[in-house]
Amino acid sequence: MKIALIHYRGGLMDGVSLEMEKWKKVLTKMGHEVHIVAENKKEGVDLTLKEIGFENPDFERVNRNFFGGIKDFLSEKEFLDFLKEKEEELFHILNEALKDYDLIVPNNIWSLGLFPSLGLALSRLEKNFVAHHHDFWWERKHLIPENRRFREILDKHFPPDLPNVKHVVINTIAQRELKRRRNIDSVVVPNVMDFSSPITSEEMYHRVREELQIAPGTIVALQATRIDRRKTIELSIDVVSLLKETLTSKKEADLYNGERYSGEVILLFSGICEDEEYLKELKEYASSKGVSLLVLSEEVRKNTSLFWKLYNAADFVTYPSILEGWGNQLLEAIAAKKPVVLFEYEVFKSDIKPAGLKYVSLGDRCFRENGLVKVDERILKKAVEEISRLLFDPSLYRETVEHNFEVGKRHFSLERLEDILSREVLP
Protein backbone atom coordinates (compact mmCIF):
# COMPACT_ATOMS: atom_id res chain seq x y z
CA MET A 1 0.00 0.00 0.00
CA LYS A 2 0.90 3.64 -0.39
CA ILE A 3 0.43 5.21 3.04
CA ALA A 4 0.39 8.87 4.18
CA LEU A 5 1.11 9.71 7.83
CA ILE A 6 -0.27 13.23 8.25
CA HIS A 7 0.15 15.76 11.06
CA TYR A 8 0.32 19.53 11.51
CA ARG A 9 4.12 19.31 11.79
CA GLY A 10 6.83 16.69 11.38
CA GLY A 11 10.55 16.07 11.69
CA LEU A 12 10.69 17.59 15.18
CA MET A 13 11.28 16.25 18.70
CA ASP A 14 7.66 16.19 19.89
CA GLY A 15 6.09 12.82 20.62
CA VAL A 16 3.85 12.77 17.55
CA SER A 17 6.71 13.50 15.14
CA LEU A 18 8.86 10.80 16.76
CA GLU A 19 6.12 8.18 16.60
CA MET A 20 5.36 8.95 12.96
CA GLU A 21 9.00 8.27 12.13
CA LYS A 22 8.83 4.92 13.95
CA TRP A 23 5.61 3.96 12.16
CA LYS A 24 7.21 4.91 8.85
CA LYS A 25 10.24 2.75 9.59
CA VAL A 26 8.13 -0.28 10.53
CA LEU A 27 5.59 0.10 7.72
CA THR A 28 8.39 0.50 5.17
CA LYS A 29 10.01 -2.68 6.50
CA MET A 30 6.65 -4.40 6.00
CA GLY A 31 6.82 -3.51 2.30
CA HIS A 32 4.66 -0.39 2.12
CA GLU A 33 5.52 2.96 0.52
CA VAL A 34 5.19 5.50 3.33
CA HIS A 35 5.30 9.30 3.30
CA ILE A 36 5.11 11.78 6.18
CA VAL A 37 2.86 14.73 5.27
CA ALA A 38 3.09 17.97 7.27
CA GLU A 39 3.10 21.75 6.98
CA ASN A 40 6.77 22.34 7.76
CA LYS A 41 9.79 21.75 5.56
CA LYS A 42 11.90 19.63 7.89
CA GLU A 43 14.13 16.64 7.31
CA GLY A 44 11.84 13.63 7.53
CA VAL A 45 8.82 15.38 5.99
CA ASP A 46 8.19 13.88 2.54
CA LEU A 47 5.26 16.02 1.39
CA THR A 48 4.77 19.61 2.52
CA LEU A 49 1.26 21.09 2.61
CA LYS A 50 1.62 24.63 3.93
CA GLU A 51 -2.13 24.99 4.50
CA ILE A 52 -2.44 22.34 7.25
CA GLY A 53 -0.11 23.52 10.01
CA PHE A 54 0.60 26.05 12.72
CA GLU A 55 2.25 28.60 10.42
CA ASN A 56 -0.89 29.02 8.31
CA PRO A 57 -2.54 32.32 9.43
CA ASP A 58 -5.97 30.70 8.98
CA PHE A 59 -4.97 27.94 11.43
CA GLU A 60 -4.13 30.48 14.11
CA ARG A 61 -7.24 32.56 13.41
CA VAL A 62 -9.60 29.59 13.55
CA ASN A 63 -7.93 28.17 16.65
CA ARG A 64 -8.02 31.48 18.54
CA ASN A 65 -11.72 32.14 17.87
CA PHE A 66 -12.92 28.54 18.22
CA PHE A 67 -11.29 27.83 21.58
CA GLY A 68 -10.83 31.29 23.05
CA GLY A 69 -14.09 32.96 22.08
CA ILE A 70 -15.05 34.96 18.98
CA LYS A 71 -12.80 38.00 18.70
CA ASP A 72 -12.15 38.55 14.99
CA PHE A 73 -15.70 38.13 13.65
CA LEU A 74 -18.90 40.12 14.08
CA SER A 75 -21.04 37.10 14.92
CA GLU A 76 -21.05 33.36 15.49
CA LYS A 77 -22.64 32.90 12.04
CA GLU A 78 -19.87 34.86 10.33
CA PHE A 79 -17.25 32.69 12.04
CA LEU A 80 -19.06 29.45 11.18
CA ASP A 81 -19.27 30.59 7.55
CA PHE A 82 -15.52 31.21 7.64
CA LEU A 83 -14.96 27.71 9.08
CA LYS A 84 -17.01 26.22 6.26
CA GLU A 85 -15.14 28.25 3.64
CA LYS A 86 -11.79 26.99 4.96
CA GLU A 87 -13.14 23.44 5.08
CA GLU A 88 -14.03 23.61 1.38
CA GLU A 89 -10.60 24.99 0.47
CA LEU A 90 -8.83 22.30 2.47
CA PHE A 91 -11.02 19.53 1.07
CA HIS A 92 -9.93 20.34 -2.49
CA ILE A 93 -6.26 20.66 -1.46
CA LEU A 94 -6.29 17.34 0.42
CA ASN A 95 -8.30 15.55 -2.25
CA GLU A 96 -5.69 16.44 -4.85
CA ALA A 97 -2.58 15.97 -2.67
CA LEU A 98 -3.65 12.60 -1.24
CA LYS A 99 -5.42 11.11 -4.27
CA ASP A 100 -2.76 8.44 -4.92
CA TYR A 101 -2.64 7.09 -1.34
CA ASP A 102 -4.38 3.86 -0.34
CA LEU A 103 -4.37 4.59 3.40
CA ILE A 104 -4.29 7.87 5.33
CA VAL A 105 -3.10 7.96 8.96
CA PRO A 106 -4.06 11.31 10.58
CA ASN A 107 -2.10 11.95 13.79
CA ASN A 108 -4.01 14.02 16.39
CA ILE A 109 -5.89 15.93 13.67
CA TRP A 110 -9.16 14.28 14.68
CA SER A 111 -8.44 13.94 18.39
CA LEU A 112 -7.29 17.44 19.37
CA GLY A 113 -9.25 19.36 16.74
CA LEU A 114 -6.81 22.27 16.79
CA PHE A 115 -7.86 23.22 13.24
CA PRO A 116 -11.51 22.08 12.98
CA SER A 117 -11.80 22.98 9.29
CA LEU A 118 -8.93 20.60 8.50
CA GLY A 119 -10.45 17.72 10.45
CA LEU A 120 -13.86 18.20 8.83
CA ALA A 121 -12.32 18.38 5.35
CA LEU A 122 -10.25 15.25 5.94
CA SER A 123 -13.28 13.23 7.03
CA ARG A 124 -14.95 13.90 3.65
CA LEU A 125 -12.24 12.13 1.65
CA GLU A 126 -13.30 8.78 0.23
CA LYS A 127 -10.26 6.97 1.60
CA ASN A 128 -9.44 4.30 4.15
CA PHE A 129 -8.14 5.81 7.39
CA VAL A 130 -6.32 4.69 10.51
CA ALA A 131 -6.84 7.55 12.95
CA HIS A 132 -3.87 7.71 15.35
CA HIS A 133 -4.99 9.55 18.49
CA HIS A 134 -2.12 10.57 20.80
CA ASP A 135 -4.16 13.08 22.87
CA PHE A 136 -7.81 14.13 23.03
CA TRP A 137 -9.31 17.61 23.27
CA TRP A 138 -11.29 16.69 26.40
CA GLU A 139 -7.99 16.03 28.22
CA ARG A 140 -6.97 19.69 27.86
CA LYS A 141 -8.99 22.41 29.62
CA HIS A 142 -7.97 25.07 27.11
CA LEU A 143 -9.34 22.92 24.25
CA ILE A 144 -12.87 22.70 25.64
CA PRO A 145 -14.76 25.62 24.03
CA GLU A 146 -17.31 27.56 26.08
CA ASN A 147 -19.45 28.10 22.98
CA ARG A 148 -22.18 25.42 22.79
CA ARG A 149 -22.17 25.16 18.98
CA PHE A 150 -18.40 24.71 18.87
CA ARG A 151 -18.53 22.09 21.62
CA GLU A 152 -21.16 20.22 19.58
CA ILE A 153 -18.81 20.18 16.56
CA LEU A 154 -16.09 18.57 18.66
CA ASP A 155 -18.50 16.13 20.31
CA LYS A 156 -19.83 14.97 16.95
CA HIS A 157 -16.81 15.02 14.64
CA PHE A 158 -13.61 14.81 16.71
CA PRO A 159 -12.94 12.03 16.21
CA PRO A 160 -15.43 11.04 13.46
CA ASP A 161 -17.32 7.76 13.75
CA LEU A 162 -17.20 6.56 10.13
CA PRO A 163 -17.12 3.09 8.54
CA ASN A 164 -13.89 3.88 6.66
CA VAL A 165 -12.02 4.97 9.82
CA LYS A 166 -10.22 2.60 12.21
CA HIS A 167 -9.17 4.18 15.51
CA VAL A 168 -5.86 3.78 17.34
CA VAL A 169 -5.07 5.18 20.80
CA ILE A 170 -1.82 5.04 22.76
CA ASN A 171 -3.08 3.91 26.16
CA THR A 172 -5.91 2.00 27.81
CA ILE A 173 -7.24 5.07 29.67
CA ALA A 174 -7.88 6.83 26.34
CA GLN A 175 -9.39 3.63 24.94
CA ARG A 176 -11.94 3.42 27.75
CA GLU A 177 -12.79 7.13 27.56
CA LEU A 178 -13.31 7.07 23.78
CA LYS A 179 -15.66 4.11 24.21
CA ARG A 180 -17.54 5.83 27.04
CA ARG A 181 -17.93 9.19 25.29
CA ARG A 182 -18.54 8.11 21.70
CA ASN A 183 -19.06 4.33 21.81
CA ILE A 184 -16.10 4.06 19.42
CA ASP A 185 -13.90 0.96 19.61
CA SER A 186 -10.15 1.39 19.26
CA VAL A 187 -6.88 -0.53 19.26
CA VAL A 188 -4.17 0.36 21.80
CA VAL A 189 -0.79 0.83 20.11
CA PRO A 190 1.83 1.88 22.68
CA ASN A 191 4.67 4.23 21.89
CA VAL A 192 7.75 2.22 20.96
CA MET A 193 11.51 2.51 20.64
CA ASP A 194 14.26 0.84 18.63
CA PHE A 195 15.86 -1.62 21.06
CA SER A 196 18.02 -3.38 18.46
CA SER A 197 21.07 -1.79 20.12
CA PRO A 198 21.72 0.77 22.90
CA ILE A 199 21.77 4.40 21.78
CA THR A 200 24.77 5.14 24.02
CA SER A 201 28.30 3.82 24.57
CA GLU A 202 31.13 4.22 27.07
CA GLU A 203 33.32 5.82 24.41
CA MET A 204 30.64 8.42 23.60
CA TYR A 205 30.06 9.04 27.32
CA HIS A 206 33.59 10.41 27.64
CA ARG A 207 33.65 12.14 24.25
CA VAL A 208 30.37 14.03 24.70
CA ARG A 209 31.29 15.12 28.23
CA GLU A 210 34.63 16.37 26.96
CA GLU A 211 32.89 18.35 24.21
CA LEU A 212 30.54 19.87 26.80
CA GLN A 213 33.50 20.61 29.11
CA ILE A 214 31.98 18.58 31.95
CA ALA A 215 34.70 17.73 34.46
CA PRO A 216 35.41 14.04 35.23
CA GLY A 217 33.51 12.74 38.25
CA THR A 218 30.59 15.13 37.75
CA ILE A 219 27.16 13.53 38.10
CA VAL A 220 24.85 14.55 35.23
CA ALA A 221 21.06 14.27 35.49
CA LEU A 222 19.36 14.58 32.09
CA GLN A 223 15.95 16.23 31.64
CA ALA A 224 15.12 15.32 28.03
CA THR A 225 11.49 16.45 27.83
CA ARG A 226 10.42 19.62 26.09
CA ILE A 227 10.49 22.61 28.44
CA ASP A 228 6.80 22.99 29.17
CA ARG A 229 4.91 23.47 32.46
CA ARG A 230 3.14 20.12 32.01
CA LYS A 231 6.54 18.45 32.43
CA THR A 232 6.88 19.84 36.02
CA ILE A 233 10.65 20.15 35.67
CA GLU A 234 10.90 21.89 39.04
CA LEU A 235 10.73 18.40 40.57
CA SER A 236 13.99 17.52 38.80
CA ILE A 237 15.59 20.58 40.38
CA ASP A 238 14.40 19.40 43.80
CA VAL A 239 15.89 15.94 43.14
CA VAL A 240 19.27 17.31 42.06
CA SER A 241 19.42 19.83 44.88
CA LEU A 242 18.81 17.21 47.57
CA LEU A 243 21.11 14.71 45.83
CA LYS A 244 24.02 17.14 45.87
CA GLU A 245 23.38 17.92 49.53
CA THR A 246 23.11 14.22 50.42
CA LEU A 247 26.36 13.30 48.63
CA THR A 248 28.55 15.81 50.48
CA SER A 249 30.28 12.98 52.37
CA LYS A 250 30.76 10.96 49.15
CA LYS A 251 33.30 13.26 47.53
CA GLU A 252 36.20 11.23 46.07
CA ALA A 253 34.21 7.98 46.41
CA ASP A 254 34.10 5.69 43.36
CA LEU A 255 31.06 6.06 41.13
CA TYR A 256 29.44 3.15 39.23
CA ASN A 257 31.74 3.81 36.26
CA GLY A 258 35.00 3.90 38.23
CA GLU A 259 35.36 7.68 38.23
CA ARG A 260 35.80 9.50 41.52
CA TYR A 261 32.88 11.73 42.46
CA SER A 262 33.98 15.37 42.18
CA GLY A 263 31.27 16.79 44.40
CA GLU A 264 29.48 18.38 41.42
CA VAL A 265 25.98 17.52 40.14
CA ILE A 266 24.60 19.11 36.96
CA LEU A 267 21.05 19.12 35.57
CA LEU A 268 21.16 19.09 31.77
CA PHE A 269 18.16 20.26 29.69
CA SER A 270 18.16 18.75 26.18
CA GLY A 271 14.51 19.29 25.23
CA ILE A 272 13.32 22.10 23.00
CA CYS A 273 11.92 25.08 24.90
CA GLU A 274 8.23 25.77 24.27
CA ASP A 275 7.71 28.20 27.17
CA GLU A 276 10.39 30.87 27.64
CA GLU A 277 8.71 32.26 30.75
CA TYR A 278 8.74 28.83 32.38
CA LEU A 279 12.42 28.37 31.49
CA LYS A 280 13.18 31.70 33.15
CA GLU A 281 11.33 30.57 36.29
CA LEU A 282 13.23 27.26 36.29
CA LYS A 283 16.57 29.08 36.06
CA GLU A 284 15.64 31.30 38.99
CA TYR A 285 14.42 28.33 41.02
CA ALA A 286 17.57 26.32 40.26
CA SER A 287 19.72 29.26 41.34
CA SER A 288 17.81 29.52 44.63
CA LYS A 289 18.35 25.78 45.24
CA GLY A 290 22.05 25.81 44.34
CA VAL A 291 21.55 23.65 41.24
CA SER A 292 23.83 24.06 38.21
CA LEU A 293 21.89 23.98 34.93
CA LEU A 294 23.27 23.26 31.48
CA VAL A 295 20.58 24.36 29.02
CA LEU A 296 21.12 23.13 25.45
CA SER A 297 17.57 23.60 24.16
CA GLU A 298 18.52 26.09 21.46
CA GLU A 299 21.42 23.96 20.23
CA VAL A 300 19.10 20.95 19.97
CA ARG A 301 16.49 23.00 18.11
CA LYS A 302 19.11 23.85 15.49
CA ASN A 303 20.52 20.31 15.34
CA THR A 304 18.11 17.55 16.40
CA SER A 305 20.78 14.84 16.16
CA LEU A 306 22.39 16.45 19.23
CA PHE A 307 19.33 15.42 21.25
CA TRP A 308 20.20 11.73 20.95
CA LYS A 309 23.91 12.37 21.45
CA LEU A 310 23.26 14.01 24.82
CA TYR A 311 21.91 10.80 26.34
CA ASN A 312 25.55 9.68 26.37
CA ALA A 313 26.47 12.40 28.86
CA ALA A 314 23.88 11.35 31.45
CA ASP A 315 24.35 9.25 34.58
CA PHE A 316 20.60 9.11 35.14
CA VAL A 317 17.43 10.58 33.62
CA THR A 318 14.74 12.60 35.38
CA TYR A 319 11.15 12.19 34.17
CA PRO A 320 8.94 14.13 36.60
CA SER A 321 5.92 14.82 34.32
CA ILE A 322 2.61 14.58 36.15
CA LEU A 323 0.65 14.14 32.90
CA GLU A 324 1.71 12.15 29.83
CA GLY A 325 -0.17 10.37 27.06
CA TRP A 326 2.56 7.75 27.09
CA GLY A 327 6.22 8.48 27.85
CA ASN A 328 8.68 8.79 24.97
CA GLN A 329 11.57 10.06 27.09
CA LEU A 330 11.06 7.15 29.47
CA LEU A 331 11.55 4.68 26.61
CA GLU A 332 14.54 6.68 25.37
CA ALA A 333 16.18 6.47 28.80
CA ILE A 334 15.63 2.70 28.86
CA ALA A 335 17.12 2.34 25.37
CA ALA A 336 20.06 4.52 26.48
CA LYS A 337 20.60 2.20 29.48
CA LYS A 338 20.20 4.96 32.05
CA PRO A 339 18.36 4.69 35.40
CA VAL A 340 15.18 6.76 35.61
CA VAL A 341 13.68 8.88 38.37
CA LEU A 342 10.00 9.42 37.63
CA PHE A 343 6.67 10.64 38.93
CA GLU A 344 4.10 7.86 38.57
CA TYR A 345 1.59 9.57 36.26
CA GLU A 346 -1.69 7.78 35.48
CA VAL A 347 -0.74 6.23 32.12
CA PHE A 348 2.53 4.97 33.56
CA LYS A 349 0.62 3.16 36.29
CA SER A 350 -1.99 1.67 33.96
CA ASP A 351 0.05 0.78 30.86
CA ILE A 352 3.80 0.78 31.58
CA LYS A 353 4.36 -0.18 35.22
CA PRO A 354 2.85 -3.70 34.78
CA ALA A 355 5.70 -4.54 32.37
CA GLY A 356 8.04 -4.69 35.38
CA LEU A 357 10.49 -1.82 34.98
CA LYS A 358 12.92 -0.93 37.77
CA TYR A 359 12.82 2.80 38.53
CA VAL A 360 13.20 5.38 41.28
CA SER A 361 9.76 6.69 42.24
CA LEU A 362 8.68 10.21 43.16
CA GLY A 363 5.29 8.78 44.12
CA ASP A 364 1.97 9.46 42.45
CA ARG A 365 0.75 12.44 44.47
CA CYS A 366 1.79 16.05 44.23
CA PHE A 367 0.73 19.50 45.42
CA ARG A 368 1.44 23.11 44.50
CA GLU A 369 3.42 25.52 46.60
CA ASN A 370 4.19 29.07 45.44
CA GLY A 371 3.19 28.11 41.91
CA LEU A 372 5.53 25.10 41.77
CA VAL A 373 4.69 21.40 41.83
CA LYS A 374 6.05 19.52 44.85
CA VAL A 375 6.05 15.98 46.23
CA ASP A 376 6.17 14.91 49.86
CA GLU A 377 9.62 15.54 51.37
CA ARG A 378 9.86 11.97 52.69
CA ILE A 379 9.25 10.53 49.21
CA LEU A 380 11.82 12.90 47.72
CA LYS A 381 14.38 11.88 50.35
CA LYS A 382 13.73 8.17 49.72
CA ALA A 383 14.12 8.69 45.96
CA VAL A 384 17.44 10.48 46.43
CA GLU A 385 18.71 7.66 48.67
CA GLU A 386 17.85 5.15 45.92
CA ILE A 387 19.63 7.21 43.25
CA SER A 388 22.67 7.46 45.49
CA ARG A 389 22.83 3.69 45.87
CA LEU A 390 22.63 3.23 42.10
CA LEU A 391 25.31 5.80 41.34
CA PHE A 392 27.85 4.25 43.71
CA ASP A 393 27.09 0.54 43.12
CA PRO A 394 28.34 -0.76 39.73
CA SER A 395 26.50 -4.09 40.02
CA LEU A 396 23.16 -2.54 40.98
CA TYR A 397 23.47 0.11 38.26
CA ARG A 398 24.28 -2.47 35.57
CA GLU A 399 21.58 -4.91 36.70
CA THR A 400 18.93 -2.14 36.71
CA VAL A 401 19.64 -0.76 33.24
CA GLU A 402 20.09 -4.21 31.64
CA HIS A 403 16.82 -5.44 33.17
CA ASN A 404 14.95 -2.39 31.85
CA PHE A 405 16.51 -2.75 28.39
CA GLU A 406 15.20 -6.32 28.16
CA VAL A 407 11.75 -5.25 29.36
CA GLY A 408 11.73 -2.50 26.73
CA LYS A 409 12.79 -4.90 24.01
CA ARG A 410 10.01 -7.32 24.98
CA HIS A 411 7.12 -4.88 25.38
CA PHE A 412 7.89 -1.58 23.63
CA SER A 413 10.04 -2.40 20.58
CA LEU A 414 9.61 -1.77 16.86
CA GLU A 415 8.97 -5.51 16.52
CA ARG A 416 6.06 -5.17 18.94
CA LEU A 417 4.69 -2.31 16.82
CA GLU A 418 4.96 -4.41 13.66
CA ASP A 419 3.09 -7.25 15.35
CA ILE A 420 0.18 -5.02 16.46
CA LEU A 421 -0.06 -3.22 13.11
CA SER A 422 -0.14 -6.44 11.11
CA ARG A 423 -2.58 -8.28 13.40
CA GLU A 424 -4.95 -5.56 14.61
CA VAL A 425 -4.64 -2.32 12.65
CA LEU A 426 -3.93 -2.53 8.92
CA PRO A 427 -6.83 -3.31 6.59
From Swiss-Prot:
- The EC class name is transferase
Q: Which reaction does it catalyse?
A: (2R)-2-O-(alpha-D-glucopyranosyl)-glycerate + GDP-alpha-D-mannose = (2R)-2-O-[alpha-D-mannopyranosyl-(1->2)-alpha-D-glucopyranosyl]-glycerate + GDP + H(+)
Question: Its domain of life?
Answer: Bacteria
What EC number is given for this enzyme?
2.4.1.-
Query: Record's InterPro entries?
Result: Glyco_trans_1, manno_glu_gly_synth
* Gene3D superfamilies with a match to the protein in the record: Glycogen Phosphorylase B (3.40.50.2000)
Necessary cofactors: Co(2+); Mg(2+); Mn(2+); Ni(2+)
Q: How does activity depend on pH?
A: Optimum pH is 7.0.
Which segment of the chain is annotated as a signal peptide?
A: none
Keywords of the record, alphabetical order, are: Cobalt, Glycosyltransferase, Magnesium, Manganese, Nickel, Transferase
What does this chain do? Catalyzes the synthesis of mannosylglucosylglycerate (MGG) from glucosylglycerate (GG) and GDP-mannose.
Q: Which family does it belong to?
A: Belongs to the glycosyltransferase group 1 family.
Q: What is this protein called?
A: Mannosylglucosylglycerate synthase
The organism is Thermotoga maritima (strain ATCC 43589 / DSM 3109 / JCM 10099 / NBRC 100826 / MSB8)
Q: Identify the gene encoding this protein.
A: mggS
